[in-house]
Amino acid sequence: MYNFIMYAMQLGVRIAARFDSKVRKMWRGEQAAFGVLQQRVDPSARYVWFHAASLGEFEQGRPLMEAIRREFPDYKILLTFFSPSGYEVRKDYKGADIVTYLPIDTVGNARRFLRTVRPVMAFFVKYEFWYNYLHILNHRGVPTYSVSSIFRPGQIFFRPYGRQYGRVLRCFSRFFVQNEESSLLLSSIGIDQVEVVGDTRFDRVLQVREVRKQLPLVERFVGDSHRVFVAGSSWLPDEELFLRYFASHPEWKLIIAPHVIKEEHLAQISQLLQGKKVARYTQSSEETVADADVLIIDCFGLLSSVYHYGRVAYVGGGFGVGIHNVLEAAVWGMPVLFGPNNKHFQEAQGLIAAQGGFEVSDDAGFAQLMDRFTKDEAFLQESAGRAAAFVEKLTGATERVLQAVKPELEKNCQAQS
C-alpha cells in the first residue's frame, strides 16, 4: 500500500507540476537530483547525510550539521530537501558539500540514491519517516538517527490500524526526541532506543543571536523610540488583529515582516495602514525611513535579526495552520504574542508556562495585553527576562546528540585510516 501511494504521489506531482510553479520546481529538482549526485559525489569520500523536509527542519538540523563538520572535517556533508521552500533558500548553503532534492520514496529511487551516495551515517530531522530509504539504510547497517523528533498520541504509529506502518520506526538506530512524552509513546510500541535531548532549535537561535546582521536602515527607523512592535511571519488575520489596535495607538512604531511577500498581500497591508506613514525596506533610504510609522520588511533573510530591534514581538500563523518560530523572537529577550493555534507547539506552550509568551485570540485580549505593556514597564521587562531565560535554559541538545554519535563517527574514521 505504501509503495502504491508513493507511485501515485510521483504521478500526482508530475501532473500538478503543469499548473503550479512551486510543484514544478520540486518536480524538476527531483528529476535533476540523480544527475547532480552523479556529477558531484566523490566515490572515495565518506558522506554524512542530513535530510530536512523544508527550511524549518533545516534550521533544526543545522547546529548538528555544523558541529560534525567542525569536529570531523574528514567527512563530507550531503543535505537533501523535500520542499522547494527549503531547497530554494538553502541550495547554496556552504555548510554542506552537496545540496539537492530527495527523490520521491519509491523503491527504485531509494536504491539508486543510496547506491550512489553510500552514506556512512544518516540523520532525518523531526517528522521525516520515508520507509524505503529507511528500510534500505537499515538493511545496509548504516547508523540512522531521528533528530529533534516529537511524537503525539494521535499519530498513525500509535493507532491500531497504523502499527504496520509503525514498523518504519524500527529502522532507526536511535531517536533523539524533544520530550519525555515522545519517549514514553515510543516505548509503548516496543521502541526503546530513545534519548530525550531537547530541541536543537534552541541552540540554533542562540547561534543566530551571536552573529546577527547589522541593519542600519532598521536602526534609523527605530531611532530613539522605546516602543517598537515587531510582527514576524504574519498572515492577513494576524495583521488585521494587531493593526486595528495600532490604528489608535500612534505611540508604537511597527515593523512588519509578513510571511507572504507578494504585491497583492503587501497592498492588503498598506490598505489596513491608511493614515500612517509606511516605508518598505527595499524601497527606502535612511533619510526616507526616519519619519515612517511602519516599516514593512519586504524581503527574506532578515527576520531573525530584525527581532533585535523590538520591545514586543508577535509571531504569526496562530489563526491558520499553526504558529511560526517563536524562539527567534524570544531569544532577544522580549515578550512574544501569538494566536490560538499553538497547542501542538511545545516551545510556545513552554513559553506561556514561563510567562514570557502570551496567547491572544481576539481584539479585546490583544488590547488588554498591549495596554499593560504600554503602561507597566516593570511587567514588560519581567516578561522579556522570562522569555530569554526560557530559551537559555533549554539549550544543549546539539551537544548531547553529538556526544551520542561521536563514537560511531570516530570508529568510521579509524576504519578508514
Mark where each language-model region is.
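Nucleotide-activated sugar donor-binding and catalytic core shared by glycosyltransferases
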Residues: 1-417
